[in-house]
C-alpha cells in the first residue's frame, strides 16, 4: 500500500476554541483558512482511506475459466503503490513568509499600544492627581473643566453668564477698542 | 441646620411620650370613633397619631417639622497623602477640604471656638461674662451705636427660626440632592474623559491576545490544510484504483454469467423445438387422446 511516512486524517486545530480568542478581523482570516480546510476535510472523510482487500482465491474458484486473467490482475493489484507525496517546499516557505508578515504586524501593534498607553497614562495621571470633585476649589474647576468654566484673571474674554456667545465674534472687542464712547469705525471726525 | 442643635430634644421627647400615653389611654376605650371627641381627632391628625381604628399613622404635612436633617452618605474625604504639589507642606497647611456640616455656634451667632479657649480657665460662665461685658462696654461708650431700625433684627431672627424649624429639613434634603447631582455631572465628565483610556486598554489587550492566538494557531492550520489536501488527493487516487479493479472483476463475473445464460437459453430452445415437433404428429394426437380417455374412465370409477 502507501509508503507515506505520515498521514493526516483530521486537522489538529481546535477551530472553535481558537476563534473565541480572536477579534473580528483575525476571525475573518481564520474563517477563510477554515473554509479551505473544511473542503479537504469533507473530501477526506468521504473517500476511502486504503485499497480494499480482494479475495482472489475465492474469485478463482468462482471463475475457473478466467484464472489466468485473475492471476495477472492479482499481481498488478498487489504491486500497485500509490505515491503520497509531500507538501512542496515553496508552499512551506509561503507559510514562513506569512509568519514573518504576522510578526511585523505584531511589532507594529505593540508600538501602537505603547503610544496609546502613554496617552492613556497621561489622562489617568491627570485625574489621579486631581482632588476629589467634592473638594474642588474655584481654580480647580477652571483647570480641570476648561470647556465649562473660565477665569477672567488671566483669560482675555468678556463675561458671558447667559451664554449668548459674546466671545464668539470679535465685534464687541473691536467696537470698544477705542475708549471714545459710541464711535463708529466708519465715522469721519472732521469737525 | 446648626440651629437645631440648640433645641432640647429631651423636651420634645417628653411631650411626645405624653402624647403617646394619651393615645394609649384612649386605645383601651371601647373601639368606636365616637369615643374620641371632634377636636381631639383634629389634634391627633396634626400630631400624626393614629386613631384607635387605624392601623397606620396618617401622613401629615408636619412630619418634617422640627426634624434635624443629616446626610445619608457623607462626602468622600480628601486622601491623607494628597498633595497638589510635591513641595506642599501638609502638616501646617492641609488641603482645605469642604466640611460636611457648619461649625458649632453658641447663641446662634458666636463660634464655639471663641468659648473653648476661656472655658479651661474661667469655667462655663467666663466666656459669656467676657463677651457680655465687652458688649456692654461698647454700648456704654457709644462705640456700638444702635440704629433705630436695629430692633427689627429680633424679628428676622424669629422669622429665620420659624422657617428653619418648619421647612429646614426639606430645604437641606433638596440642597443635598442638588449638590449630589451637580457633583455627579462633573464625575460624569471625568468618566467620559477616562472612558477612552479604559476602552483603549481593553481593546488593545483583546487585540494582543488575538495576535498571540493567531500566531500560535495560524501556521499550524495552514500546514494542516496542505496536509489534508495531500490526503484528499491520495484518497482520490485510492478510489480511482479501487473503481478500476472492481470494474474489471465485475467484467469477468459478467462474462461468466453471460456464458451460463447463453447455455441455458440454447437448452430451452432445443427442448421447446422437440416438443413442438412431436405434438404436430397425428400419431401423437391419437395416442394422447387414448391416454386421456383412459384417465377419465379411471376417474369415473
Swiss-Prot record, chain B:
Any one Gene Ontology cellular component term annotated for this protein: non-motile cilium
Transit peptide, start-end: 1-21
Record flagged with keyword Transferase: no
Disrupted-gene phenotype: RNAi-mediated knockdown results in sterility. RNAi-mediated knockdown does not affect the timing of hypodermal and vulval development.
Subunit structure: Subunit of the F-type ATPase which has 2 components, CF(1) - the catalytic core - and CF(0) - the membrane proton channel.
Protein function: Mitochondrial membrane ATP synthase (F(1)F(0) ATP synthase or Complex V) produces ATP from ADP in the presence of a proton gradient across the membrane which is generated by electron transport complexes of the respiratory chain. F-type ATPases consist of two structural domains, F(1) - containing the extramembraneous catalytic core, and F(0) - containing the membrane proton channel, linked together by a central stalk and a peripheral stalk. During catalysis, ATP synthesis in the catalytic domain of F(1) is coupled via a rotary mechanism of the central stalk subunits to proton translocation.
Protein name: ATP synthase F(0) complex subunit B1, mitochondrial
Organism: Caenorhabditis elegans
Lineage, top ranks: Eukaryota, Metazoa, Ecdysozoa, Nematoda, Chromadorea
Amino acid at each position: 500500500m502507501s509508503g507515506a511516512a505520515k498521514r493526516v486524517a483530521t486537522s489538529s486545530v481546535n477551530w472553535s476554541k481558537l476563534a473565541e480568542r480572536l477579534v473580528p478581523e483575525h476571525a475573518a482570516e481564520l474563517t477563510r483558512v477554515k473554509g479551505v480546510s473544511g473542503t479537504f476535510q469533507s473530501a477526506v472523510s468521504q473517500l476511502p482511506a486504503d485499497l480494499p482487500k480482494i479475495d482472489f482465491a475465492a474469485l478463482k474458484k468462482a471463475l475457473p475459466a478466467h484464472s489466468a486473467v485473475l492471476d495477472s490482475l492479482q499481481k498488478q493489484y498487489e504491486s500497485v503503490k500509490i505515491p503520497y507525496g509531500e507538501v512542496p517546499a515553496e508552499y512551506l516557505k509561503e507559510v514562513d513568509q506569512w509568519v514573518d508578515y504576522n510578526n511585523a504586524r505584531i511589532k507594529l501593534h505593540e508600538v501602537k499600544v505603547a503610544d496609546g498607553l502613554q496617552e492613556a497614562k497621561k489622562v489617568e495621571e491627570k485625574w489621579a492627581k486631581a482632588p476629589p470633585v467634592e473638594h474642588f476649589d474655584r481654580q480647580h474647576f477652571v483647570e480641570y473643566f476648561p470647556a465649562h468654566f473660565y477665569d477672567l484673571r488671566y483669560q482675555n474674554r468678556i463675561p458671558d453668564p447667559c451664554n449668548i456667545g459674546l466671545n464668539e465674534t470679535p465685534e464687541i472687542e473691536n467696537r470698544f477698542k477705542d475708549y471714545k464712547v459710541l464711535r463708529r469705525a466708519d465715522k469721519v471726525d472732521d469737525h | 441646620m446648626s440651629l437645631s442643635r440648640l433645641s432640647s430634644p429631651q423636651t420634645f421627647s417628653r411631650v411626645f411620650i405624653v402624647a403617646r400615653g394619651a393615645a394609649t389611654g384612649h386605645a383601651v376605650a371601647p373601639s368606636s370613633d365616637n369615643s374620641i371627641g371632634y377636636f381631639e381627632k383634629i389634634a391627633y391628625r396634626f400630631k400624626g397619631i393614629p386613631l384607635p381604628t387605624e392601623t397606620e399613622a396618617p401622613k401629615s404635612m408636619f412630619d418634617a417639622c422640627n426634624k434635624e436633617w443629616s446626610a445619608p452618605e457623607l462626602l468622600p474625604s480628601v486622601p491623607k497623602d494628597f498633595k497638589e504639589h510635591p513641595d506642599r507642606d501638609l502638616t501646617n497647611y492641609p488641603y482645605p477640604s469642604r466640611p460636611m456640616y457648619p461649625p458649632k455656634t453658641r447663641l446662634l451667632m458666636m463660634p464655639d471656638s471663641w468659648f473653648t479657649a476661656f472655658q479651661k480657665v474661667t469655667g462655663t460662665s467666663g466666656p459669656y461674662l467676657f463677651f457680655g461685658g465687652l458688649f456692654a462696654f461698647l454700648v456704654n461708650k457709644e462705640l456700638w451705636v444702635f440704629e433705630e431700625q436695629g430692633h427689627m433684627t429680633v424679628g428676622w431672627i424669629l422669622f429665620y427660626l420659624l422657617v428653619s424649624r418648619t421647612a429646614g429639613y426639606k430645604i437641606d434634603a433638596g440642597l443635598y440632592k442638588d449638590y449630589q447631582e451637580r457633583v455627579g455631572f462633573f464625575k460624569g465628565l471625568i468618566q467620559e474623559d477616562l472612558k477612552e483610556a479604559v476602552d483603549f486598554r481593553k481593546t488593545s489587550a483583546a487585540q494582543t491576545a488575538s495576535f498571540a492566538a493567531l500566531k500560535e494557531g495560524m501556521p499550524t492550520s495552514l500546514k494542516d490544510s496542505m496536509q489534508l489536501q495531500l490526503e484528499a488527493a491520495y484518497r482520490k487516487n485510492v478510489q480511482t484504483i479501487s473503481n478500476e479493479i472492481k470494474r474489471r472483476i465485475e467484467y469477468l463475473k459478467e462474462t461468466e454469467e453471460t456464458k451460463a445464460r447463453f447455455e441455458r437459453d440454447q437448452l430451452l430452445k432445443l427442448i421447446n423445438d422437440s416438443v413442438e415437433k412431436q405434438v404436430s404428429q397425428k400419431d401423437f394426437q391419437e395416442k394422447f387422446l387414448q391416454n386421456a380417455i383412459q384417465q377419465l374412465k379411471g376417474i369415473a370409477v
